[in-house]
Amino acid sequence: LDKDSIVKRKVFHTLLSIEEAELKLEQLGLLKPIGEEEVELENAYGRVLAEDIFSPIDYPPFDRSEVDGYAVSIKSVEGADELHPKKLKVVGKVSIGEIPSISIAEDFTTSIDTGAIIPKGADGIIMEEYTERVTPNEVIVYKSIVPGENISFAGSDISLGELVLKKGTRITYKEIGVLAALGISRVRVFKKPKVVVVSIGNELQKPGTKLALGKIYDTNGYAITSFLKQRGFDVRYHGILPDSEEVVYNEITKLLTSFDVVITSGGTSAGEEDITYRVFERLGTILVHGLRVKPGKPTVIAISREGKILFGLPGFPFSALSVAMLLLVKVLERLEGFESRLMIARAMSTFKVRKDIGRTWFMPVILSSIGGKLFAILLQTSSGSVSALLKADGIAIIREDRDYVDEGEEIEIARFGDELKEAVIIGSHDTLLTMLLTRFGIIDRVSIGFVGSYRGLQLMRRGYIDVSPIHLLDPATGEYNIPFIEKDKELSNKAVLVRGYRRKLVLAFAKGNPKNVKGFEDILRTDIRFVNRNRGSGTRIYIDKVLEDIAKSSSQSFSKIVRNISGYWYEVSTHTGVAAAIAQGRADVGVCTEHAAMLYNLDYIPLTWEYYDFLINVHSMDKNIIKKFIEGLRNPLTKDVVNGFRGYEAPSEMGLKLCC
């Protein structure tokens, strides 16, 4: 590195845990509300109370009837029942909203509305259902009552001077309802901090523009802004800034005149070109430079000379969201006078993981509820994953003092929401599947993960998931899926195999076939780079089976054949991933579905048809959503949809049980 680069390069200072970072900001007096203001009740939703609220009245403010019926003296109906009814004289009616002038004496009554003031002399209310009005002036009562029955007494709900809401309470529709009932029209609340989000990076483009090679669309700016809006913060997205220290410095300087908190995304790693640290240092004082978490280590927090918070999030989406969820939200809530508790669930780990002691790991998980147990299923993604934001139900938190988590252990999960999805579908990838789930009207009610057929099979064998899509070729029989279930006694006792549909696999290559590919054997050519599917996928099994046949026919070992294939270890996890690699010139040839090849305008040679079936947990068969899924597969209209997609076929037995 040259001298300038060495000067610019920053190493991380002492790394802090999430808790230590929050405590440091608190000890410096930075996590205090920024001010108070009074607002009209109709504008108070989502705000945080800056003072205790004491009731200015009794509630209810008067003794009132809880039912429609008759106001009586207890003595008048003593001993009354179906066999010994009492006849009372009706002396009028008390309507809601009016002050009664009637006084109830023994053997007299008055009809009364729900919510009306209790007239003098009445001890209770007989419900209308236990009476019979025989004349306009007489009523027969078939039930006795106890003192105070069906009466709500003044102050019985809330008493005059009672503490109703505490300072620091976030106002929801419930609090607004109570305040309105007490006649309170204005409340004193903490001011909401004004927050702005800025994305930094030369590689970023605005969604809606044509994506250039090597560029990515800005995810964090939109995702973090929306996430904070969902949490009720006053936040604005400012846009994308280039990796220029001067541009970022000047822009943030301007933003600090209008906002209380500036959040940046990107430009936070300890590399020579990352500039967030240097900009924050010029604007004020660095307080936190690096967290003991993975992902999320390159987080920067500073205080500007104006006393405003600068918060630098990492550039990778899952990393940024994890830190935003577990630390940034806490900071912003403290600035508006609120202290929340993170929604933590406990779930059984379905995976084993070794980690280094000294850092807390954040891992995206899908949550599966089967047989009264909650399972956490790891999504195998990187911190740069965008799909993890969509697929995950929460973040598994593996604390820094742990170096190993075993399958079956209980672990902490920071939940993204209150509700669990009704079913979990994990297994082989297929584009048509999500379209069918949408057509069945259940796409929003299921969690989906594409991990390959073998991993789906393993999760099903352990009883962790509801449905596993598979397409596994048995090399011995040439049959798909059924042999794997029949040979596995444990699996066959836990799941049934339901027929799905057929897909055409093709050998795909660039339009015009510039490499003059004629067949599968051409992937052995030294001038051709192959893109493979991930280990554990059904397509990988097919590829390796074909390569084994080639090895046998040429009297070579499988390992030797593999060593000679350029790109054999270049693995992607989806059919569209294969097609994209070819379309973008990162590979010359690969095996994918015909549909994926067409999406990327590739040429191809047909290889084989495979069955894409559904393994279903026997304990899930009674779930309404699983019944709806199977019914959808059996629907003749669904077969028409499947047959309408190039490279797909719907067999006559689609949706029927195959075994076991």
Regions found by a protein language model. Give the residues of each.
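A ligand-binding cleft/hinge motif common to bilobed small-molecule-binding domains
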Residues: 469-487, 579-608
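N-terminal segment of the mature folded domain
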Residues: 441-522
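Short, glycine/charged-enriched hinge/interface segments at domain edges or termini
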Residues: 2-7, 11-18, 52-53, 71-238, ...
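Short loop->beta-strand "edge-of-pocket" segments that line small-molecule binding or catalytic clefts
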Residues: 422-429, 521-546
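Helix-rich terminal scaffold detector
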Residues: 2-19, 185-313, 317-323, 435, ...
